[in-house]
Amino acid sequence: MKHPSLIFLTGFSGSGKSTIGPLLANSLGYDFLDLDKEIERQADKPITRIFAEEGEDHFRERERAMLESIVGRKELVVSLGGGALQNNDCFSLIISSGTMVYLHSSPLILAKRMSHKTDRPLMKGENGERLSSEEIEKKILALLEHREPRYKTAQIMVETDTKRIGTTVEELTRKIERYVRRAEKNQNSHSQTKKQSRK
C-alpha cells in the first residue's frame, strides 16, 4: 500500500539530500534514513569501495534490498542515492510506496559542491584519478540528461541552488504536510467508496 508520509528525497549527488533530510525529518516529526550511509554501514565499507570491488550492479542490488525493507513504513524521510531511480526495480518500489521529493540544483552548483568531496564514484575518472571541476560538470550534465526525466516524476520539487537550508526545510515542510493531508484524505474517501460499493 502507498503511504504518502513515506518521503523519498531524490536529486543529484550534492543537491543537499543528506544535509536537508535529517532537518526535514525533525521538522515533520518523522524518522530519517540515509540509504547510502545505511548500505555503507551494512557492507562495512564506503560506497567507493563497493563500486570498485563489487561493481555498480551489485551496489544497486543492495539498494533495492534496502528499499524493500522499508516499503510500508510511515512518517519516514529517506535520502536516496543520486542514481537510485535509474534502477527500474528501485524506481517502481519508490513510486508505488510513497511520496517523492526532488531537490533540484544546477550543474554548475553541483560541480562546485562535489569538488569538496572525495568519497563519491562521480569524482573519479575511469582509472580512479580525481577529476577537475570542469570534468565533473561535464560528467554531471551527461548523467542529468539520463536521470532528470525520472527526477521530474516527483510529486514535489524545490530549488536548492541559492536558498538557505533553513528556508528550504520550511518550504518543504509546508509542501509535504499539505500534500500528505490531501493524499490521505483522498485515500480515505476512496476506501469509503469501495466499502459502500460492496454493501
UniProtKB/Swiss-Prot annotation:
PROSITE patterns: SHIKIMATE_KINASE. Its cofactor is Mg(2+). Substrate binds at residues 36, 60, 82, 147. ATP binds at residues 14-19, 120. Its main location: cytoplasm. It is an enzyme of class 2 (transferase). Residues 179-199 are annotated as: Disordered. Pfam families: SKI. Its EC number is 2.7.1.71. It catalyses: shikimate + ATP = 3-phosphoshikimate + ADP + H(+). Pathway: Metabolic intermediate biosynthesis; chorismate biosynthesis; chorismate from D-erythrose 4-phosphate and phosphoenolpyruvate: step 5/7. GO terms for cellular component: cytosol. The keyword Cytoplasm applies. Binds 1 Mg(2+) ion per subunit. It comes from the Bacteria. Keywords: Amino-acid biosynthesis, Aromatic amino acid biosynthesis, ATP-binding, Cytoplasm, Kinase, Magnesium, Metal-binding, Nucleotide-binding, Transferase. It is found in: Cytoplasm. GO terms for biological process: amino acid biosynthetic process; aromatic amino acid family biosynthetic process; chorismate biosynthetic process. GO terms for molecular function: ATP binding; magnesium ion binding; shikimate kinase activity. Catalyzes the specific phosphorylation of the 3-hydroxyl group of shikimic acid using ATP as a cosubstrate. Belongs to the shikimate kinase family. This is Shikimate kinase. It comes from Chlorobium phaeobacteroides (strain BS1). The lineage of its organism: Bacteria, Pseudomonadati, Chlorobiota, Chlorobiia, Chlorobiales. The gene is aroK.
